[in-house]
Structures are given as C-alpha cells and as structure tokens.
From Swiss-Prot:
Binding note for cofactor: Binds 2 magnesium ions per subunit. The magnesium ions are essentially bound to the substrate and have few direct interactions with the protein.
Organism: Crithidia fasciculata
Name this protein carries in UniProt: Hypoxanthine-guanine phosphoribosyltransferase
GO-annotated molecular function: guanine phosphoribosyltransferase activity; hypoxanthine phosphoribosyltransferase activity; magnesium ion binding; nucleotide binding
Residues annotated to bind Mg(2+): 182
Record Gene3D superfamilies: 3.40.50.2020
Protein family according to the UniProt entry: Belongs to the purine/pyrimidine phosphoribosyltransferase family.
Lineage: Eukaryota, Discoba, Euglenozoa, Kinetoplastea, Metakinetoplastina
Entries under PROSITE patterns matching the protein: PUR_PYR_PR_TRANSFER
GO BP annotations listed: GMP salvage; guanine salvage; hypoxanthine metabolic process; IMP salvage; purine ribonucleoside salvage
Keyword Transferase: yes
Recorded name of the encoding gene: HGPRT
Cofactor needs: Mg(2+)
C-alpha cells in the first residue's frame, strides 16, 4: 500500500501549543486516515483467515507509537480483525534531533511470534534505520508474515532503502512532536502532530 494521505485540511478543532510553529495533522485527521488504513489492512489480511487462535500481532514500537497503536487496534476491531498487542523498543535516537545511526534493542517481544502474522507499528519513519533493523530482527524469528504500518512517513529522510507497507500520512522534512512523539521525553501528550519550534530543540533539554 503506497497511497498515503498528505496532511489533511478538513475542518477540525483548532488547538494551539506554545512550542509548536504549526500543526501537520490534527487528532481528528489522524483518526480519519487511520480508519481508512485499517480498512485496507482488514481487506489485505482476509487471505490469512485471522481468528482468535490466529490473530494479527501488532508490534508497538515504544515509546512513540503507543497512541497510534491504541487507535489502530480499535479501528481494526471495528473491521472485525482480531489482534494481540506486543511491545518492542529499539532506537537510533538519544535526546537529540538527529539519528545516531546505531540501533539499540531496548525491549524484545515477550510472546513467541514464530508462525504468527506480525505488523510492526511505528509512529514515524525518517532515515528508516531503526525500522530496517527491526524487520531483520523479527524476520529471524520466522513469522508467518511480516509487514509495517507507519503513521508518519518522511521518504525524503531515507538513509536506507525501505518501503513501508502501510504509510498512513506522508509529511515533509520537519521535527514533529505530539500524539505520542516527543522531544527529550516532552510533548507526547499533545493531541495533534505538530512541528516543534526551532528554538525549543536548540535549547538544553533541562530547560524544556
């Protein structure tokens, strides 16, 4: 699936955040795009005869994708897709705005996933270094299938060749926060996806 939406322009409640210079996607626009993506996933996975005994495993990549995973799970439920949720954590970022290029696995899935249908759920893909690492790591566990769904795709930032199976929204190059995504662990609680003002990530994290 490559027909990701661009940031929507439909009417939605206007929320203002002092650390944001603009909003890329409101909570309501995210929900609309995620619901559409869930319908496509449900259609594509019919071939696997999913059931409570053969569910779709959503692998929530912590920390940033926790809100997206929760909403996606509910929209998949609306489409009749049985899911299980597992958590995994790997990062090529520290508290800076640039990737280090070195991926560290911080948390592995707890359940055995051999012969299971796995869907990696990411908040954002920029360089794709972390997602490429996770795909290789999880493929070694011999799942029945392995695909990726990403809320925000930034193709212009790629440092490795990688295509996302289900990109929900395509965004331009920008440092974004909100809807689970952070800068130095701040701003995850914002309802919308916003662009962080430059002066915020140029100041020490202790001053946030």
């Amino acid at each position: 699936m490559s027909n990701a939406a661009s940031p929507a322009t439909s009417a939605a409640p206007v929320r203002h955040y002092p650390m944001s210079c603009r909003t890329l996607a409101t909570q309501e626009q995210i929900w609309s795009a995620t619901a559409k993506c869930a319908k496509q996933i449900a259609e594509d996975y019919k071939q696997y005869n999913l059931s409570d005994e053969n569910p779709l495993y959503l692998l929530c990549v912590l920390k940033g994708s926790f809100m997206f995973t929760a909403d996606l799970a509910r929209f998949l439920c609306d489409e009749g897709v049985p899911v299980r949720i597992e958590f995994i954590c790997a990062s090529s970022y520290g508290t800076d705005v640039k990737t280090s290029g070195e991926v560290r696995l911080l948390l592995d899935v707890r359940d055995p996933v051999e012969n299971r249908h796995l869907l990696i759920v990411e908040d954002i893909v920029d360089s794709a270094i972390t997602l490429e690492y996770l795909k290789r790591f999880l493929q070694a566990k011999q799942p029945a299938s392995l695909k990726t769904v990403v809320l925000l795709d930034k193709p212009s930032g790629r440092k490795v060749t990688l295509s996302v199976d289900y990109p929900v929204i395509t965004i331009p190059h920008a440092f974004v926060i909100g809807y689970g995504m952070d800068f130095a662990e701040a701003y995850r609680e914002l309802r919308d996806v916003c662009v962080l003002k430059k002066e915020y990530y140029e100041k020490p994290a202790s001053k946030l």
